[in-house]
């Protein structure tokens, strides 16, 4: 910043730039100095400290001044310093120096860079120059300055980077790459892009044209691991084996304990050892042959005990597999993949490709590479009532094997028998046809149904007194099985499903069943009928039924049972039709009176008997059962459970008539019962009187015993009660006492705390009041003393001012004036008093008579003159009283 002062004092080691405005040339003035500025000069800035470069430091000056051989600054013809424009000058430690006009301190004072051991500076030449040894350096040359040492910077040299040495430890290698043609530190020539490894343990400082790619760790090999490698190019490995591009091989612990992958080796992974136990084997695909190449498409079976590494290109077909150890109930189904001979020398059997055969245990079997294990078979244990469906794959024939343990042969497979969905559902429900027939289907449908094994023989347990029909579609014949029995279906057999009516009234196809119950049983139906007088009624009838089978061994007889699929609906419809026809011909009153007989006759019908009426006609006799010849169903009885009119008016009329009949019957029964009761009462009364006397005697005895027991019981009870009450009261008293003591103690503590607090409060209040009262009294006493002193002083000063004679005159002036006033009035005596002074009037009479109190005339006393106490009240010398307070009583002669 320019300064306008004329005298500039320049301290030591300071400088200024002075501009000559006439010649427009600047020069430097260095202190210590007092510079007097001329009018044509201008100081460009205040004195500035010189640039001081301490030891082991440097700075960079741009546009430096030119110097001669002796180091003196050169000037041009105008007196301006000569500058090397666009040039740099690095100045090391020296005496403080000023900056000439035009010089710029481009880089401030900077410590010299110290190159530590195991480090180097990567230097690059920016300009051509000769070093201190006289060697020519061309622009673009690169070299390293290795430590330890101090780097002296040059303007022609650029520091590219600082290179650190890489520490190579045991089982490590340094991977390098040449950036251009060079010689490595071992004296080998390297071409651009070439890579190599340095395995020497220690610190390695890469050369200038060497690029560090990474630090490669050695792979530690054990007995259980191997290293899988692949060649990137043709080279010779550490064992001296020539490798071709793409070739793969393994390195195991037998080759080396720790392997550092070469730059031409690609690590594909670590291969674990494959260990086979005594009961293991494996199948190797594409095994390596004696020539070291993979035999594509070939297989090799290896059986344990053995440990090996899978060579490159080899793989296990299904991993490590267990040897097939077969027991007596196990077998293996095998298939030949290639022609082979199986068995020992004498029992060799030739198999063609695709042949299937079964081997049975007990034995250990390892399949060869030419054999495929189709499946492992187990003998299927079967009870007497269990079975399986077996199909011959060659003939296609299906048969059922029941009752013995069976193992499938090589030509047999398990066959699945399909059942209709309805039959499948009925079998999976597991309901008892007899015990669970009244339960709802939804009660068990919520439970998940276990899937049926379709290869097992379908069996069904026929309950007692029931029948199941099985139809063979191949033989086209049916068979009926009566329970209790277990029926098993053949491969071509199916159950006959019954679709029965159910509900009230009956609904068709409401229930399905596999077995037919033979009864006896009952079913209930609700039907609507109409009488001859058009009264509509609703009947609920229950029928007892059973099936009548004369010969269960006769196929035609047993087939009749299943001839009607819905025997319930068919029977209910037939019986309802008969009942409607019979009721339609009678009136409501007749049906109401004879409903059971009419319905029974309609259901069972009549049969002709030999009995005749008086007219000689045969009398019909009602039957006791109804038989349905189609299926042998027999209805043995009918129960009329309810009869309800459908019409509301008919229902009300019927209800009234029923109530009236009930009342009549009730009244007659009541009268008969009352008469019988009176008779029985008379008889019982006599017995009662006799019994009463006997009972009284017994009662007295019992009362005596009762009183004794009561007394004893009361004594025991009172003792126990008293004891319990005493204990409870004592316990209650103890608890109450403890509570009272604790409460009193707490109250006493609280009262003591309150009393102590109140006492302290009152004490402090009294102390403060006492201090206050004492202060007030002291103030009052002081005030009274001061007032008294003031009054005394005032009175003294007044008396001194007035004088004794004046005071006497003032005291006497009043009474004398009053006396003179009274004398002027002619009054002989006066009395002046107030209300508080008593007046003695006993001598008033003497005054009225003109006599004194002693009986002397007043004239004498007046003539002699009044005494000082007469005629004037003692209060006359006092101050004048207020009007009305004193009474003047004149005394007249």
Swiss-Prot record:
Domain comment as written in the entry: MVP 3 mediates interaction with PTEN. MVP 4 mediates interaction with PARP4.
Subcellular location: Cytoplasm; Nucleus
MVP repeats mapped onto the chain: 2-56, 57-111, 112-164, 165-217, 218-272, 273-323, 324-379, 380-457, 458-520
Gene: MVP
Record protein name field: Major vault protein
Record GO cellular component, one term: cytoplasm
Residue ranges of the region described as Disordered: 856-893
Covalent link location (Glycyl lysine isopeptide (Lys-Gly) (interchain with G-Cter in SUMO2)): 444, 704
UniProt key word Acetylation: yes
Modified residues (N-acetylalanine): 2
Taxonomic source organism: Pongo abelii
Function: Required for normal vault structure. Vaults are multi-subunit structures that may act as scaffolds for proteins involved in signal transduction. Vaults may also play a role in nucleo-cytoplasmic transport. Down-regulates IFNG-mediated STAT1 signaling and subsequent activation of JAK. Down-regulates SRC activity and signaling through MAP kinases.
Keywords: Acetylation, Cytoplasm, Isopeptide bond, Nucleus, Phosphoprotein, Repeat, Ribonucleoprotein, Ubl conjugation
Phosphoserine modification, residue list: 445
Pfam families the UniProt entry points to: MVP_shoulder, Vault, Vault_2, Vault_3, Vault_4
PROSITE patterns: MVP (PS51224)
Subunit (UniProt): The vault ribonucleoprotein particle is a huge (400 A x 670 A) cage structure of 12.9 MDa. It consists of a dimer of half-vaults, with each half-vault comprising 39 identical major vault protein (MVP) chains, PARP4 and one or more vault RNAs (vRNAs). Interacts with TEP1. Interacts with PTEN and activated MAPK1. The phosphorylated protein interacts with the SH2 domains of PTPN11 and SRC. Interacts with APEX1. May interact with ZNF540.
Post-translational modification: Phosphorylated on Tyr residues after EGF stimulation. Dephosphorylated by PTPN11.
């Amino acid at each position: 910043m320019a300064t306008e002062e004329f005298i500039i004092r320049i301290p030591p080691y300071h400088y200024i730039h002075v501009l000559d405005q006439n010649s427009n040339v600047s020069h430097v003035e260095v202190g210590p100095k007092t510079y007097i500025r001329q009018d044509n000069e201008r100081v460009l800035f205040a004195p500035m400290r010189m640039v001081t470069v301490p030891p082991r430091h440097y700075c960079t000056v741009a546009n430096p001044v030119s110097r001669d051989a002796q180091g003196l600054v050169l000037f041009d013809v105008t007196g301006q310093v000569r500058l090397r424009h666009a040039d740099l000058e690095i100045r090391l430690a020296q005496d403080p120096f000023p900056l000439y006009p035009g010089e710029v301190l481009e880089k401030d004072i900077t410590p010299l860079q110290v190159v530590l051991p195991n480090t180097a500076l990567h230097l690059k030449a920016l300009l051509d120059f000769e070093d201190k040894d006289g060697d020519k350096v061309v622009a673009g040359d690169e070299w390293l300055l290795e430590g330890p040492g101090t780097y002296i910077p040059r303007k022609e040299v650029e520091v590219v980077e600082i290179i650190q040495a890489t520490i190579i430890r045991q089982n490590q290698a340094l991977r390098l790459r040449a950036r251009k043609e060079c010689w490595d530190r071992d004296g080998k020539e390297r071409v651009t892009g070439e890579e190599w490894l340095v395995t020497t343990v220690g610190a390695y400082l890469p050369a200038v044209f060497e690029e560090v790619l990474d630090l490669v760790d050695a792979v530690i090999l054990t007995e259980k691991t191997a290293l899988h490698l692949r060649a990137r190019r043709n080279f010779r490995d550490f064992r001296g084996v020539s490798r071709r591009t793409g070739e793969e091989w393994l390195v195991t612990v037998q080759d080396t304990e720790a392997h550092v992958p070469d730059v031409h080796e690609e690590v594909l992974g670590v291969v674990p050892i494959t260990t086979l136990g005594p009961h293991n084997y494996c199948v190797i695909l594409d095994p390596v042959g004696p020539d070291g190449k993979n035999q594509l498409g070939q297989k090799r079976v290896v059986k344990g005990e053995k440990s090996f590494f899978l060579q490159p290109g080899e793989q296990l077909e299904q991993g490590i597999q267990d040897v097939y150890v077969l027991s007596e109930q196990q077998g293996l189904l095998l298939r030949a993949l290639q022609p082979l001979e199986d068995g020992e020398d004498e029992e060799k059997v030739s198999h063609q490709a695709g042949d299937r055969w079964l081997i049975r245990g007990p034995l250990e079997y390892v399949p060869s590479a030419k054999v495929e294990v189709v499946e492992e078979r187990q003998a299927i244990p079967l009870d007497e009532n269990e079975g399986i469906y077996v199909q011959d794959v060659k003939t296609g024939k299906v048969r059922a094997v029941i009752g013995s343990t069976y193992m499938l042969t090589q030509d047999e497979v398990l066959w699945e028998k399909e059942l209709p969905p309805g039959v499948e559902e009925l079998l999976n429900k597991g309901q008892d046809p007899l015990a669970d027939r009244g339960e709802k289907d939804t009660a068990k449908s919520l439970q998940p149904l276990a899937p049926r094994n379709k290869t097992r023989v379908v069996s069904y347990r026929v309950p007692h007194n029931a029948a199941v029909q099985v139809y063979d579609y191949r033989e086209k014949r049916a068979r009926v099985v009566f329970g209790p029995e277990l029926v098993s279906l053949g491969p071509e057999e199916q159950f006959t499903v019954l679709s029965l009516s159910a509900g009230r009234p009956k609904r068709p196809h409401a229930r399905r069943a596999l077995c037919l119950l033979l009864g006896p049983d009952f079913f209930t139906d609700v039907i609507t009928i109409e009488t001859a007088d058009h009264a509509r009624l609703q009947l609920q009838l229950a029928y007892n039924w059973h099936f009548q089978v004369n010969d269960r061994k006769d196929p035609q007889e047993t087939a009749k049972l299943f001839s009607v699929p819905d025997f319930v609906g068919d029977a209910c419809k037939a019986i309802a039709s008969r009942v409607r026809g019979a009721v339609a011909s009678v009136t409501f009153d007749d049906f109401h009176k004879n409903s059971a007989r009419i319905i029974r006759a309609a259901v069972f019908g009549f049969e002709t008997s030999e009995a005749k009426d008086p007219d000689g006609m045969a009398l019909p006799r009602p039957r006791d059962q109804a038989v349905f010849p189609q299926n042998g169903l027999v209805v043995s009885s009918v129960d009329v459970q309810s009869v309800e009119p459908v019409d509301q008016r008919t229902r009300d009329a019927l209800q009234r008539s029923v109530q009236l009949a009930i009342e009549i019957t009730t009244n007659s029964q009541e009268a008969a019962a009352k008469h019988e009761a009176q008779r029985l009462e008379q008889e019982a009364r006599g017995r009662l009187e006799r019994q009463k006397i006997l009972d009284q005697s017994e009662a007295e005895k019992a009362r005596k015993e009762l009183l004794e027991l009561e007394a004893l019981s009361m004594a025991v009870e009172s003792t126990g009660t008293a004891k319990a009450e005493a204990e409870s009261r004592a316990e209650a008293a103890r608890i109450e006492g403890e509570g009272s003591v604790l409460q009193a103690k707490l109250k006493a503590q609280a009262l003591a705390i309150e009393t102590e607090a109140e006492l302290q409060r009152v004490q402090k209040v009294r102390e403060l009041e006492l201090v206050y009262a004492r202060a007030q009294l002291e103030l009052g006493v002081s005030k009274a003393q001061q007032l008294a002193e003031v009054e005394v002083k005032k009175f003294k000063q007044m008396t001194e001012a007035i004088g004794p004679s004046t005071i006497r005159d003032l005291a006497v002036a009043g009474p004398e004036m009053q006396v003179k006033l009274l004398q002027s009035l002619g009054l002989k005596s006066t009395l002046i008093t107030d209300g508080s002074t008593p007046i003695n009037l006993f001598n008033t009479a003497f005054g009225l008579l003109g006599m004194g109190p002693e009986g002397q005339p007043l004239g004498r006393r007046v003539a002699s003159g009044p005494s000082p106490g007469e005629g004037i009240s003692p209060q006359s010398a006092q101050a004048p009283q207020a009007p009305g307070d004193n009474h003047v009583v004149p005394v007249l002669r």
